[in-house]
A protein has these predicted regions:
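Surface-exposed, active-site-proximal loop segments in enzymatic domains
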Residues: 95-101, 105-110, 143-168, 194-211, ...
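Lectin-type carbohydrate-recognition ectodomains
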Residues: 477-653
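Aromatic-rich peripheral "rim/lid" segments of glycoside hydrolase catalytic domains that contact
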Residues: 389-480
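Secretory targeting and sorting signals
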Residues: 1-42
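Extracellular glycoside hydrolase catalytic/binding regions
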Residues: 107-114, 118, 208-210, 214-235, ...
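N-terminal carbohydrate-binding accessory modules
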Residues: 38-39, 47-136
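An active-site-proximal structural segment forming one wall of the substrate-binding cleft
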Residues: 109-137, 145-147, 153-235, 262-270
């Protein structure tokens, strides 16, 4: 979320300075990510619009993923052409009377419900969304909304009297119901903890800022269960713009209370247990470090996913997200001057070619097919100041950035869709695509004077993949660096199968095909997956199933029984402890080959996730896509420490 501070690009919270003990400055952080550069494109001069009836008939919920694409229940591409309808996260900027427009973003007092309901009937707002060519809506909320029992002022819903006397959550319910009834897909977005306009040091920096992780998860389960029967509520966007607080950075995979990777994965799997139909949207780290000329600072976005991606119990439910704004940069907070301002380049400073490369490096690389990290990338926030803006660099950036989205056929959500106009008809927030004055009169993107219209229509009307998307093969990594990674629904429902050891379990539809040597990481796939057989899964801790000759003389071996394949493993420190083996429905070959990786990587020349590193800094062994992992050899000799040295790979047929 960006601020309305003057100039438009600068967030007001940069005025605050971190305590001297933190040796820092306030962090205000904008969006993240795009893709490769595109040549100028041409498109219709108006957005392609559907009626609610047409939009509802064009897709069927729930949504899932196939590789880099989101698809509907029929397997047809559903490209998110979305907007952000802000307000329910709060517009108060943190000081003074919460009801004073001067203390709210752009003078807009949302009363903690989506903006515009005081001045325009809900049906008209939705019709205007259709006119923009949107098919989906990111709907921010604060955790405070869930627990708020107060009723909104009548004036806050003056144009929608049916909403009088309702709590903010009940108004949110009504908005969700209206959106989905009119054909829109809705993605719930946990934007803030408290009612507060993001960002900076506002007490909302992480999922567990101003609340516990347990409360955050409980709130998500409440929201998911609340809308579970509405299959047009398609996704849970876990948290907005995770960033540094006064004292510490968020991280990706460190195993502590600030570990976004672990927190998001746990929450995502709990959400899928409550509603297996939901998409789980994970935005990368928006900011780390202290922005000065002498201290480290950066905007990581999705870059950590390259070597440490998330694995959910459902491999077809993960979507990654990123935010991009012209005035921010890979290491630039967006501050114009004073605290937080550095000389690092902004996204608007890059040439089209440079911007395309940066956006790819920070986000769109995730869409590369056949890797452990492959998933759709949703640019869930981007935007620019429109009517009245004279910022040539931002305008050039917007043109170049939308070209990138077009070229890469990228899912997107503009920030924000709805704002207010003042008594003179001027937008109070000129980033909004639609502005309504106190009488309900609309000033929209399609009205004369908004320079963004051509690029918006280019984006909305751009050629895209449509129709059926072919099923894809999945590769997913397991990370036992700091504890178990159990993404098997079956095993989650059972007891501890390797007590006292760290355990990794593949999703129920996948098998284990690779291990890292010394870091306890693993790789799963469903490539050529054999049909699952009946019977118990077997925990193997010794050599009792080595029945077709000693395939690794002098080494300890863990080998699955005949006609079973490895689906999990356990380790103590980094030494092998056990294999978990699942039965196949039909007999499996018992001949195979050894894949030794004690002196270097031994991975297929082609095939799954071979172009990406799921265990950086360690040797990796990996069976081919048409093989199953039947055994692991290890030794305590020669200071090997019991880490895996070889895999027994057998053909699937």
């Amino acid at each position: 979320m960006r601020s309305d501070s003057s100039p438009p690009a600068v967030r007001s919270s940069f005025a605050r300075i971190l305590p001297a003990a933190a040796a820092a400055v306030t962090l205000v952080l904008g969006g993240t990510s795009a893709s490769a550069a595109a040549p100028p494109t041409t498109a219709s001069t108006t957005a392609s619009a559907m009626t609610g009836t047409q939009l509802a008939a064009s897709w069927t919920g729930p949504l899932s993923t196939r590789g880099r694409y989101i698809v509907d229940a029929n397997g047809d591409r559903f490209k998110l052409k979305a907007g952000n309808w802000a307000g329910a996260q709060g517009t108060w900027e943190g000081s003074g009377d919460v009801n004073d427009p001067a203390n709210n973003q752009a003078g807009q007092v949302s009363h903690n419900i989506p903006l515009g309901l005081d001045r325009t009937p809900l049906t008209q707002i939705l019709a205007d969304f259709h006119g923009l060519g949107l098919n989906s809506m990111r709907l921010p909320f604060a955790n405070a909304l869930i627990h708020d029992t107060s009723t909104v002022p009548d004036a806050a819903v003056a144009a929608n009297p049916q909403l009088k006397g309702k709590t903010p959550l009940q108004v949110y319910d009504a908005v969700v119901a209206a959106l989905t009834a009119d054909g829109f897909a809705v993605i719930l977005n946990n934007h803030t903890t408290t009612y507060r306009f993001c960002c900076g040091l506002d007490g909302n920096e992480r999922w567990n800022s101003s609340q516990s992780t347990e409360q955050w998860e409980a709130d998500w389960l409440f929201m998911v269960q609340r809308y579970r029967t509405n299959k047009r509520v398609v996704g849970a966007d876990l948290r907005n713009e995770v960033r540094r607080d006064t004292w510490d950075n968020p991280n990706w995979g460190w195993g502590d209370s600030h570990d976004e990777y672990a927190a998001f994965e746990e929450a995502g799997n709990r959400i899928l247990a409550a509603d297996p139909d939901m998409l789980v949207v994970m935005e990368g780290i928006n900011w780390s470090g202290i922005p000065t000329a002498i201290t480290w600072h950066e905007r990581p976005m999705l870059t950590p996913v390259r070597n440490l991606s998330n694995t959910l119990v459902r491999s077809d439910k993960l979507v990654y997200a990123a935010h991009f704004y012209a005035y921010t940069g890979p290491a630039n907070t967006g501050a114009e001057s004073g605290p937080g301002s550095t000389s690092d380049p902004r996204y608007q400073d890059f040439t089209p070619e440079q911007l395309a490369q940066v956006v790819n490096d920070e986000a769109l690389f995730v869409t590369q097919s056949g890797q452990h990290f492959t998933a759709p990338v949703w640019i869930s926030e981007f935007g620019a100041a429109g009517r009245g803006s004279t910022n040539a660099k931002e305008q050039a950036w917007f043109h170049n950035f939308t070209d990138i989205l077009v070229k890469n056929d990228t899912d997107f959500a503009q920030w924000p869709v709805v704002g207010w106009s003042d008594a003179n008809g001027n937008p109070q927030d000129n980033w909004a695509l639609l502005s309504y004055d106190a009488t309900g009169k609309r000033l929209g993107l399609g009205d004369p004077g908004d320079w963004r219209a051509a690029d918006w229509n280019k984006l909305i009307n751009a050629p895209s993949l449509t129709g059926p998307v072919a099923p894809v093969t999945h590769w997913n990594m397991l990370d036992l660096d700091f504890g178990d990674q159990n993404v098997s629904t079956r095993m989650l429902a059972q007891g501890d199968w390797s007590n006292g050891n760290r355990k990794g379990n593949c999703p129920d539809t996948e098998r284990l095909v690779g291990l890292g040597r010394g870091d306890s990481r693993g790789l799963c796939t469903d490539a050529g997956q054999p049909a699952a057989g009946a019977g118990d899964w077997v925990t193997v801790t010794d050599e009792r199933y080595v029945t077709h000759g000693d395939w690794a003389p002098g080494y300890n071996k863990l080998q699955c029984p005949d006609n079973t394949y490895a689906v999990g493993y356990s380790a103590h420190s980094n030494a092998m402890s056990a294999l978990l083996c699942a039965p196949a429905a039909a007999p499996l070959p018992t001949t195979g080959r050894n894949a030794w990786f004690d002196h270097g990587d031994n991975r297929p020349a082609t095939g799954g996730s071979t172009a990406s590193d799921w265990a950086p800094g360690y040797y990796k062994g990996q069976c081919a896509d048409n093989e199953y992992l039947a055994g692991v050899a290890y030794t305590w000799k020669w200071n090997h420490g019991g880490v895996p040295d070889a895999l027994l790979c057998r053909p699937l047929s």
